[in-house]
């Protein structure tokens, strides 16, 4: 599940990113309203978390513009303001839920999951390719009666491939999608994670593998 977090408090944004990634979300984090709009209008996200007070454009303005563009992605508003008027303004602008700061991360993720269940765009079904299935909710990778649980970047990479099994992804594209351009990680972390995933696919006896296309990238292949 792909999540956009728009929060101008850098420490909070980083903490939320780590928390959601540990719970099998793929997260992009931005720190101002202009970037929140630019990312959100792409329609690539299953859910968006918007802080009310951000530079360049506040959360309500971002929300109104996204809804005006026809973006139906479920949106959760976060704010230090707890007044009823602010909640009403957010809901009137098209917010799906609202949580005042400070909050418990467990309550936040519970609300996000509930928001996803209510959304028509939410797809809780298993992802499948050949003899392989991946449960996006739990990270369980299974072949026949054998399974293992993926976490962190390995889960995010496998989910990317399982959602587009015939698509070739370059290492650079994987780096951008999973780590983000602002991350200081080196490109070889992609190769390491691909290698680890190949070993895990083999360990559960799957015919499916991550095949390298020389000069192009990697694709998920069912070697039947």
What is the meaning of each model-derived region?
Residues 114-127, 166:
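The C-terminal output helix
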Residues 208-224:
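A short linear beta-strand->loop->alpha-helix hinge motif most characteristic
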Residues 24, 109-112, 136, 178, ...:
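Short amphipathic alpha-helical/adjacent loop interface patches that line ligand
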Residues 130-140, 216, 224:
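Short boundary/linker motifs that mark transitions into or out of structured domains
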Residues 140, 145-208, 214:
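Positively charged, aromatic-enriched patches within helix-turn-helix-type DNA-binding elements
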Residues 1-119:
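N-terminal/domain-start alpha-helical segments
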């Amino acid at each position: 599940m792909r999540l956009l977090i728009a929060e101008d408090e850098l420490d909070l944004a980083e903490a939320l990113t780590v928390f959601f990634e540990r719970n099998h979300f793929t997260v992009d984090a931005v720190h101002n309203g202009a970037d929140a709009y630019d990312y959100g209008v792409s329609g690539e996200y299953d859910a968006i978390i918007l802080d009310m007070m951000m530079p360049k454009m506040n959360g309500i303005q971002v929300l109104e513009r996204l809804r005006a563009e026809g973006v139906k992605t479920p949106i959760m508003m976060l704010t230090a303001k707890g007044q009823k008027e602010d909640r009403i303004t957010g809901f009137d602008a098209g917010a799906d839920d609202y949580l005042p700061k400070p909050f418990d991360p467990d309550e936040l993720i519970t609300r996000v999951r509930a928001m996803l269940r209510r959304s028509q765009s939410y797809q809780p079904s298993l992802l499948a390719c050949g003899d392989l299935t991946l449960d996006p909710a739990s990270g369980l990778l299974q072949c026949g009666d054998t399974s293992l649980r993926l976490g962190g970047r390995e889960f995010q990479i496998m989910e990317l491939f399982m959602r587009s099994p015939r698509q070739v992804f370059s290492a650079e594209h994987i780096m951008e999608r999973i780590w983000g351009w602002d991350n200081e990680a080196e490109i070889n972390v992609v190769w390491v994670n691909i290698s680890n995933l190949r070993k895990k696919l083999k360990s559960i006896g799957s015919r499916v593998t991550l095949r390298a296309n020389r000069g192009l990238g990697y694709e998920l292949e069912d070697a039947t």
